[in-house]
């Protein structure tokens, strides 16, 4: 047998042995995660913005499971707080960030000042900034959560947080407080109670 063939067979045997050991170890030493943390993490918006004081949504979910407040997520808003309260069996709290009076903002890059350093792209947790090295960067307004994390790393201070104008598309419609009457049952009840001729 040639030396190359022996080396290939030896490497294949070693790979199979180590693969079997790793497969056994992953099953034997598996760490079971808390299912409530997974449920909380599913409810959170996954923006990884850090506005809650934690480095991402998963650490915040773990903190909630350990008793932290459920009202620290600005991108999730009041709807997320209500879902978390329902899941955790606690009272619905008002947001810790005063979301009702806060104007939604998005990042705006003054492209005439941008040097294309990509520091803002690296800081953005939701990939709302596009551009390349030594190229102008721009913000995708619909993707930006307004977390403000891109402003500090910018060496030329060309990023500004600007308020989003309220339109019919982004206005906070409160559908759950508008009284809606189901008239389908009333119509069938009325026709059933009419005397037949």
Curated annotation (Swiss-Prot):
Domain 4Fe-4S ferredoxin-type: 105-134, 135-164
UniProt: [4Fe-4S] cluster 1 binding residues: 49, 52, 57, 73
Record's subcellular location: Cell inner membrane
EC number(s) on file: 7.-.-.-
Pfam families per UniProt: Fer4_21 (PF14697), FeS (PF04060)
Chain residue ranges for the region called Hydrophobic: 1-26
Binding site for [4Fe-4S] cluster 3: 124, 144, 147, 150
Gene Ontology molecular function: any one: electron transfer activity
Location of the 4Fe-4S domain: 32-90
Residues given in the record as [4Fe-4S] cluster 2 binding sites: 114, 117, 120, 154
Cofactor(s), by name: [4Fe-4S] cluster
Record-linked PROSITE patterns: 4FE4S (PS51656), 4FE4S_FER_1 (PS00198), 4FE4S_FER_2 (PS51379)
InterPro entries: 4Fe-4S_dom (IPR007202), 4Fe4S_Fe-S-bd (IPR017896), 4Fe4S_Fe_S_CS (IPR017900), Elect_transpt_cplx_RnfB/RsxB (IPR010207), RnfB/RsxB_Proteobac (IPR016463), RnfB_subfamily (IPR050294)
Broad class of enzyme this protein falls into: translocase
Record's keyword terms, sorted: 4Fe-4S, Cell inner membrane, Cell membrane, Electron transport, Iron, Iron-sulfur, Membrane, Metal-binding, Repeat, Translocase, Transport
GO cellular component entries: plasma membrane
Gene Ontology biological process terms in this record: electron transport chain
Cofactor note: Binds 3 [4Fe-4S] clusters.
Job description of the protein: Part of a membrane-bound complex that couples electron transfer with translocation of ions across the membrane.
Family classification: Belongs to the 4Fe4S bacterial-type ferredoxin family. RnfB subfamily.
UniProt protein name: Ion-translocating oxidoreductase complex subunit B
Higher taxonomy: Bacteria, Pseudomonadati, Pseudomonadota, Gammaproteobacteria, Vibrionales
Gene: rnfB
